[in-house]
């Protein structure tokens, strides 16, 4: 299913010098977001920085949200992940997409202008209404959590 989402280009290099986000394959779930930087940024081990994408989106549909996720290769090979682990973009947000990047690796990492730094996935949203109760109906699991089912 394809859905149209309003996007605003905030930096004229996006779509020219830096490609617009696209799906790499027909089966891709995520769109790659790029670093819209003037110069390379050196990120020391343990450091975080906010990187602009040069884009703003307005999802508008309250049954959708977007999540920003790390790129698997950056995390596995270089220890580069999102500073907030997952970024949530609500349907009514209209500001620039900024990516919080954390270097959890042992070496400095350089973020180059135009580099693919994160991916964005659109997800369905269900807003819940709480029903206050005194007790729950019993289930097999009950209150068991955090490893209650073992490792094997």
Curated annotation (Swiss-Prot):
Which InterPro entries would you find in this protein's record? dUTPase, dUTPase-like, dUTPase-like_sf, dUTPase_trimeric
List the catalytic activities from the record: dUTP + H2O = dUMP + diphosphate + H(+)
One of the GO biological process terms: dUTP catabolic process
Query: Gene name on record?
Result: dut
Q: Where does substrate bind?
A: 71-73, 84, 88-90, 98
- Per its record, how is this protein called by name? Deoxyuridine 5'-triphosphate nucleotidohydrolase
Pfam annotation, one family: dUTPase
Q: Specify the enzyme's EC class, one word.
A: hydrolase
Keywords carried by this UniProt record = Hydrolase, Magnesium, Metal-binding, Nucleotide metabolism
The pathway where this protein functions is: Pyrimidine metabolism; dUMP biosynthesis; dUMP from dCTP (dUTP route): step 2/2
Top-level taxon in the UniProt lineage: Bacteria
List the EC numbers from the record: 3.6.1.23
Known cofactor(s): Mg(2+)
The cross-references to SUPFAM superfamilies, in alphabetical order and at most eight, read: dUTPase-like
């Amino acid at each position: 299913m394809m859905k149209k989402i309003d996007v605003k280009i905030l930096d004229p290099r996006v779509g020219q010098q830096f490609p617009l986000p696209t799906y790499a394959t027909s089966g891709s779930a995520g769109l790659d977001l790029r670093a819209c930087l003037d110069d390379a940024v050196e990120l020391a081990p343990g450091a975080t920085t906010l990187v602009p994408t040069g884009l703003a989106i307005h999802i508008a549909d309250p049954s959708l949200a977007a999540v920003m996720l790390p790129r698997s290769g950056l995390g596995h090979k270089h220890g580069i992940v999102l500073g907030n682990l997952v970024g949530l973009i609500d349907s009514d947000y209209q500001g620039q997409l900024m990516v919080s990047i954390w270097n959890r690796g042992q070496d400095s990492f350089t973020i180059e202008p135009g580099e693919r730094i994160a991916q964005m996935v659109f997800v369905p949203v269900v807003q819940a209404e709480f029903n206050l109760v005194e007790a729950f109906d019993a289930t097999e699991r009950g209150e068991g959590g955090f490893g209650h089912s073992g490792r094997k």
